[in-house]
Structure formats: structure tokens, C-alpha cells
From Swiss-Prot:
Chain coiled-coil ranges: none
Subunit structure: Interacts with calmodulin.
CDD domains documented for this protein: IQCD (cd23767)
Domain IQ: 103-132, 926-955, 956-978, 979-1001, 1113-1142, 1143-1165
Keywords noted in UniProt: Developmental protein, Disease variant, Repeat
Natural source organism: Homo sapiens
UniProt-recorded name of the protein: IQ domain-containing protein N
Any GO CC annotation of this UniProt entry: nucleus
Associated pathology: Spermatogenic failure 78: An autosomal recessive, male infertility disorder characterized by a high proportion of sperm head anomalies, primarily tapered and microcephalic heads, and an abnormal acrosome structure.
A Pfam family it matches: IQ
Record InterPro entries: CellDiv_DevSignal_Domain (IPR052318), IQ_motif_EF-hand-BS (IPR000048), P-loop_NTPase (IPR027417)
Single Gene Ontology BP annotation: spermatid development
Ranges where the record places region Disordered: 34-78, 283-324, 476-496, 786-820
Amino acid sequence: MTLQGRADLSGNQGNAAGRLATVHEPVVTQWAVHPPAPAHPSLLDKMEKAPPQPQHEGLKSKEHLPQQPAEGKTASRRVPRLRAVVESQAFKNILVDEMDMMHARAATLIQANWRGYWLRQKLISQMMAAKAIQEAWRRFNKRHILHSSKSLVKKTRAEEGDIPYHAPQQVRFQHPEENRLLSPPIMVNKETQFPSCDNLVLCRPQSSPLLQPPAAQGTPEPCVQGPHAARVRGLAFLPHQTVTIRFPCPVSLDAKCQPCLLTRTIRSTCLVHIEGDSVKTKRVSARTNKARAPETPLSRRYDQAVTRPSRAQTQGPVKAETPKAPFQICPGPMITKTLLQTYPVVSVTLPQTYPASTMTTTPPKTSPVPKVTIIKTPAQMYPGPTVTKTAPHTCPMPTMTKIQVHPTASRTGTPRQTCPATITAKNRPQVSLLASIMKSLPQVCPGPAMAKTPPQMHPVTTPAKNPLQTCLSATMSKTSSQRSPVGVTKPSPQTRLPAMITKTPAQLRSVATILKTLCLASPTVANVKAPPQVAVAAGTPNTSGSIHENPPKAKATVNVKQAAKVVKASSPSYLAEGKIRCLAQPHPGTGVPRAAAELPLEAEKIKTGTQKQAKTDMAFKTSVAVEMAGAPSWTKVAEEGDKPPHVYVPVDMAVTLPRGQLAAPLTNASSQRHPPCLSQRPLAAPLTKASSQGHLPTELTKTPSLAHLDTCLSKMHSQTHLATGAVKVQSQAPLATCLTKTQSRGQPITDITTCLIPAHQAADLSSNTHSQVLLTGSKVSNHACQRLGGLSAPPWAKPEDRQTQPQPHGHVPGKTTQGGPCPAACEVQGMLVPPMAPTGHSTCNVESWGDNGATRAQPSMPGQAVPCQEDTGPADAGVVGGQSWNRAWEPARGAASWDTWRNKAVVPPRRSGEPMVSMQAAEEIRILAVITIQAGVRGYLARRRIRLWHRGAMVIQATWRGYRVRRNLAHLCRATTTIQSAWRGYSTRRDQARHWQMLHPVTWVELGSRAGVMSDRSWFQDGRARTVSDHRCFQSCQAHACSVCHSLSSRIGSPPSVVMLVGSSPRTCHTCGRTQPTRVVQGMGQGTEGPGAVSWASAYQLAALSPRQPHRQDKAATAIQSAWRGFKIRQQMRQQQMAAKIVQATWRGHHTRSCLKNTEALLGPADPSASSRHMHWPGI
């Protein structure tokens, strides 16, 4: 401040003081502020000398100021300068500035505190929100993980099963060498602890430390160490084999319970027992030997299992083959199949007795039996008592076969005899090679005949189930008084020998040569009755175990040099009946010695040069047997006297015909010294057509009563019959020497054996000529074939099977009949016909069994011998099975065509309750069944489809009908609204017209004028009748009064002019639907004073119809409209407010969430001046 300014300031202080004293005097006195101590000491003295003047004194001095001027001047001079300064405007401005600064600082402090507080609260809320969100997420995640843990584990097992599971390891603090695994880790699941199966099949020997004790493993770290330790010898598994190993828990090797069992699929049959042992094992205990090498039960079981497969695999076949043969050793099915080669196998048979219930008792004697067979066939394994099917394999090992004791039920007494037999057996076509030589009592038929049978044996089919395995036997039948392979039997009068006798001299010579070969060293045979059905060694002995064919290496021959008697062999199955004249044997008590097999065979040697092949390839996988039966009365002696005796012997082939079928055995020796070896056709094996397809032995002996072949052969009573191949099964099917067929749909067993017969079977007996086995064809007599045609196969055989039989050399099967006498010269399909049989001549007389002697002889064909008297005779009913057998074999004997057999179902004798149908009938039944099933299925499908259609149609109909109803309802609603609106408009217009017509001013004016002019009452009444009508007012639900009724209402001081009636002619309100009464006003314009009343009424009506009425209506309408519009506006405002609130809440939530992510929005801006903007919600 300048000096001039100060002077001005001091100069003006007085004026300012004066002005303050005048103008602002109350303010100054009100303050009463003590000035602060002045800086100058003189001012302090002045202030002490002049105390402050009170207000009232100030006023007084002001009043007396002119009176005391001197005193005023002195007082003004005493006013301190500080007061003036304080009271100055500048000081005041400074104070204001200071106050502003103080206010600003206080505001800043308050704002800072408030912002800090707000920021802390915001941070706290945000942290709480974040914590809440995190806690909620953790809870959700935990629930989700717990909920989906099982499915995740299963999915992990399925998809990542091969990913190795590594146990938790201390990677940071572990030694680097310890972290290295010796081998890949175990594929173990963490929860189940099941190791993977990929580590079991090893290519190199390793061992598992899990099987070692803790000492061998060192530091126990089961979760870290691998399953295989290096340089430790362990187990080596084959690539195709697996072993079941029970691993202990990897956590502890000393666990009490081992929870895991690792089992792999056994891909090799030799480890089946290992699987069983491992499953039964509860624990796996590891033992350590001295060399610290683990030795586990698994290794021991494995070592045992390596050597076990051969025993385990052959155990089933051994039990099936030799249940009673302790020394039989045969490799099992594991032997590789080779081509069929014959090995000479020497079989050692244990001598066993065959006890027979006999009438005459003789001391037991033994007779050594030579081995007469020259069959080289590989021994074959086949199931014994157990029905175990094994493929035919060669068995070049000598077997020790034990023959089981078989009791025979024959009345003729036979002693206990031990018959060592050379046994050969097969699997399926089980036939016996019977080389028994039979000798009978002297017969009437003259002529010594020497019957020679070749070493090649004919196939004979014998019924066999599991134990009835027929064996290749070269033993001779023995009677009570002699031990000789030639059994003497007494023929039965009822039996006939259906066979064919050769007529050609070359054929006779070949037969004689064969018989001479077999009968060279035969001992003397006594004439003793032999049991009719006894199962001697020459027959078909029973063996319970598996019997192998063991043909001897040397040809054993039996020569019967002299035949003095004729043997007549009879059989209930029409076995070969004949009489053989044999030379008497010089030694009746001895059997055929073993040395007989070593006698020279120069006279019978064959010049084919194929003897080795004959020795090796003789057996056609079937056992064959030679039955030398006596010729019946039709046996013709060719030569007698000095010539060597030749006997026409039909070598029969016994074939089982189950279910009561009769077969004529028609076989003979082959020409040119060669028996029928069946080299051209695969008919070496008997064609057996049994019920079981491909199983001959199972069907032939079906019942348990016929458990042995001996019992089957000895079913006859005291009738003496030769039981060489004749078998009587329970179904009363006689064993005939013919080939039956299997019921395997026309495929004979020979077809099975076709592949087994070598191509060089033509030289089986060193013959230059091949025997041709012919089926019965057109060359055989047709009438004879018609007699026996239906007996070659079972009656229930299908026609297709009969027609599809192999017919070599173009022969066609002949017609067959159902029964009756059947000549033996004809055969049907499957029966062997010797090629040297003359066609059309060789027949035989055949009787029906059980006819009690009534012989129905057929006229002999040319060249047929007349039967002897003893060939005919009464038949025992017990021999053939009783009247049921007779009834079975006594049907009409008329010739029946094959179509007759084919079109009807034949019922077997023993199966009358089980009718069998033919193939055509079965096919018709199948077709009918198929049609029925198809019809049922199609009907079901059609009904289901129709039901679906009905359901769809109902849905469519319901939808369409609903649509139509809704559409019609909408139309009806619109129509109703239109009608109602039209009616209401009409009603409103009508009412308005009536109102205006009634209250129109012109009418009332005219009425008033007329009333004023005319005084006549009658005229007025007439005028009222013309212009005025009764007033009717409708009372509706709306609260409005009629103007007319209101005007006509009675008032005070006015006379009654009208009469109002209420309740007449009610009407229904169209608005509320209620019925309301109607007010009727009568007497309008009438009163006590006629013209005055009329004038009053007209005046009142005119006053009611004032021009203000439309204005009132407009006003009311405007009020209503305003009220309605205000209501709508308010309603709309409320809706908008609610929407605004929702929008604001949404925006604020969004902003809050965005602020949680933004640091600036969370902590606020750095500039304090901008904080005021962020105190409020932005954007609102």
C-alpha cells in the first residue's frame, strides 16, 4: 500500500467512523468486540484512558453533541486506529477471504475423509462380493466334481486304460538315480489296483518284484518300482498261452488280503487246469530259496502245466476208450493228422472167460485160437462207454486190450472158455471180422462140399452202443465136447438161408481154394450142438473198453481138409442157412493151434504181386467178419468123389436192420480167388441206416437191456442157431447179411469211409480181378426184388434217401413190397450182390416168422434146389418175439409200388406210439406250419398297422374338428357382436325417434295453441288423442332419470296432472340381462282446469326443451372423456415407471459388474476434482 493510500485511508477514517456511528451503530455496538492489543504503546495507553462508551451513553452524547463540541473533538481524537482498521472494508474483505479459505480447507478435509470412507466401503463390498462369488463357484465346482467323478473314472478307464499310472513322487527332494525306473510302470488303476494285461505276455525271462519278499527287493517302494526287476530269472510265457496270476496289493507286500486277481483269456487248452488252480488259490506266497531267487506256486504250477497238456487232453479219450484196460496207451487228438497208412500192430489180449448159462456142464477146457486175420489197419481211438466223438487217427502202438466178461443166455451148454482173440475195433462203422468156421451135424443133403473163405473178410454190421464194440476175432466157436473153431449147430426148421450160390466153375474153384486155405490144419470137429446165439470168439464178442484193431502180421490160415458133415446155420434174422460138408477132423479135443498160421500158403498164393499192400491196406476203417454159414437145402454139391471137395458157401454179411426190417443177406465170394474187397465202391463199410445220423452203433442197440452183443445174439430159445453175426436187437430187427443205410439223409456210412479207403484196395487179397459190388438192379429178377425191396432200409427212411443211394455200374433199384416171402436173390439199395451171381435164377424160400409151421413156399426158380424137409418146421414164438413180431411181419404180401411206401408213414413194430412220416409228408407239414406262422404274423402286422392308422385318423379328426369349432366360434362371436351392435343401434335410434316425436316443440306448441283457441273439451280430447299418447319409460340398470318423468313428477303447490303407473309390461335390459318394470304415464295434459292445465304442461315442456340441453350433454361427454383419458394416462405412466425401474436395475447391475473388473472404477480417478462425478451412478 502506498503512502498516499495510507493518508487517504487515515483521512477517511473519520468519515467512515461517522457513517458507521450513524448508520451501523447498532451493528458496532452489537459486536462489542474487544480490539486486540495494539502494536504501539501509545495506543495501549489511550485505550486504557478511554474505556468503551456504552450505547445509551453514545445516544446521549449524540443528542448533546452540539452542546459539547469540545468534548466530541477530544473523543474522536481518542478513537484508536486499530478499530478503524478492523471496521474497514478491506479488513472485512480479508476476513471473508480467510473464511473462504478455511471453508475450502474444511470442505477438502471433509471430502477427503468422505471419499476415503466411501472407497473403503466400496472395497469392502467388492471384496465381500468377490468372496461370495468365489465361495459359490467352489461349492458348485465341488458338487460337479463329486457328481461326475464316477462317470469320469469310468470314461478314463475306457479311453485311457493304457496310460500308465505314476504314483506320487517327491521330485524335488529325490535323488536323480532313484527317479529312474528300471522298467515300464505297471498299468494300474488307482482305485481298483488292477494291473494291465499287456505286461503278462513276455518275450524274455523276467521276474516280478511283486512276487519277491521285501528282502529281495531292497528298499520297499512298491509304488515307484516297476513290476519287473532286471537280472532276475522269472517266468517265461509262451506267446499263445496265458497264466492267471494273483498279484498282491502294490502298497504292501505283506497284505493279509490280496484284492486283485489278474485273469487273462485262456487261448490254449493246455492251461485250463492252471486257470482252475489259480482261481482256487487264495493267496500267492513267495518263497526265496538259497540263491535268493523267487520260487512261487505259480512257477511250480506252470512247470506242472507244461507237462500236463498231454495228460489233460488225453484224459477224456482214455476214459472213453479203455475204462477197464489199464495198459492201453494211445496218443490223444493232439496228434497231427496224417494220411491213412496201415501199421501192423500186434495186440496183446488178455484171456478172459465167457461164462454162459448152459444146460449141460462140461469141464472147462482151453483152446488156443490162431489169428486168422490178414487185416492191416491202423489202430483207431474211439469213445467207449462215454459218447465221446473223436476224429479217426492212426495209432501205431501195440495195445493191451482186456475183454470184458459177457454172459450168454443160451440153453445149449458151453463151458467156460478162454478165447484169446485178435481184436480190431473201429470208431463209427463198428463191424466184426468173424473168421469162425462152423461145422454141423451130418445132414441129409449129400455131396461133400469144401467151402473156402478168403482171408479177406466181409463187412458185417453188428449193433453196438457204447460198450458193444465188435472186435476182429479169429477165434473158433467152442462147444461142450470140442475145442475147435468149427462150431456144430443144429439148424432150425423155420430159418432159411437167403444166399446165392455161384454156378461158374471158376467161381467154385476160387471158393474151394479159399476154404482149403482156411481149413488146412483145422482139428477134428465133433458133432455137438452149439448155442444158437452164443457170442463165441468166432462171433461178435463184446468189449466194454476201447478196442483197437490189431491185425497180426502173419497170415493165419485154417484148412479144413475133410468135411464129413453138413453144417446148417440158422438165424432168426434170416441168416445164411446152409449145409456145409466138411471132412472129419482127426483131433476132436484140440482147437486150431497157433502154428497153423505158419503153414505154407503156396496153393492159395495170389499172383498179383501186391501182398504187402494187401497186408497193410486190408481194413477199410471197419471191422469185417467172415461168416461161413451152412447152405440150406438149395445148396448144390458141384463135385464129389476124388475131386477136392468144394462147397458152395454163401459168405454172408450180417447187417443190422433196426425197426423190424427184413434183409436178405446175399453176398458171395469173389471170382478168381478174390473175395469181394469192395475196392470199386466205398461200400466196404456196412451202410447202416439207423435213426442216429452217422452213428450206427448208437441206434442199433437202443435199449439198456441189450447191453451186450452176446445177449443180443442169444435171444433165441433152445433152437440151435449159428450166432455168427446174427444179432437180435430189442426192436426185433434181425441181423441180416446185407447193407443197411444210415438215416443221414441218404448218405451211407460208406461215403464217410470213402476217404479212408486207399486207392489201392483192389489188391487187398492179392487178387488179379476186382470184385464188383453191385447193388440190386435190373439184372436181378424183378419179382424177387419186389418181395424184398422194402427191407433193405428202415421203413421210416425217406424216399429221397432211398433214391439217392449210390448205384454203381448203372444199376437201378428194383421195386419193393411190404412183406411176404422174399427170395434171397434180390436186394434193394445198399445190399451187396455178388458179381458172380447168375441173374434171374438164384432165389430162396423165405418164410414169415412165427407162422407156426405154415410154410408159404415160393415156386422155385429154374436152377433152384428143393429145400429139405427139416428146413421147414414149427417156429417157436419166443424165438422171434411173440405175436407182436408176427403181427409186424404178417402184413399183406401183395406187391406194392415204391410210391405206396413213399406216401404213407410206416410205424415200426416197437414204436407203434411214435408214427414216422415220410419226407413228403414231413415237407407238407413244414409247409403248412410255415403258412400258419406266416398267416399269424401277417395278421398281427395288419392289425397293428390298422390300429396305428386308426390312432392317426383319430388324432387328425380331433385336430380338424377342434380347428373347425374354434373357427366357427370366432365366426359366431363376430356375428353375435354384429347382431348385438345392430340391434343396439336400432334400439337407440328408435328410442331417440320416439323421444323426439313425443317432446318435439312443434307438437307442444300446436297442442298449446289449440288448447288456447278451442274451449270445447271434446275437441281437445280428440286433438289429444291424435297428438298425445301414453308415456312409457323403461327402467334400466343405468342410473339416469327420464326428462319427461322428471318434469311430470309432482311438486309442492302444483295440482296432480298425470297418473304414473309402475310395473306394467316389463322388459329385459340388454345391458345387464335383468327384467325391469316399465313406467307408464297416463293422463298427460289433463287437469282440473282444462285450458290452464294444458298451458302449464306445455309451458313446462317448453322449458324442459331449452337450448341448454345439448350443451349439458356435451359437457357431460367432455367430463367423461377427460376422466377416461386421465385414467389411461395414469395407467400408462405407471407402466412406464415400472419399465424404467427394471431398466435402471439392469443397468446398475451391469455397471457394478464392470466396475469389479476395472481398477479405475474400483478405486476412483486420481483427480480429486472429478470425484463428484463418480459419487453418483454414471449414465443415470
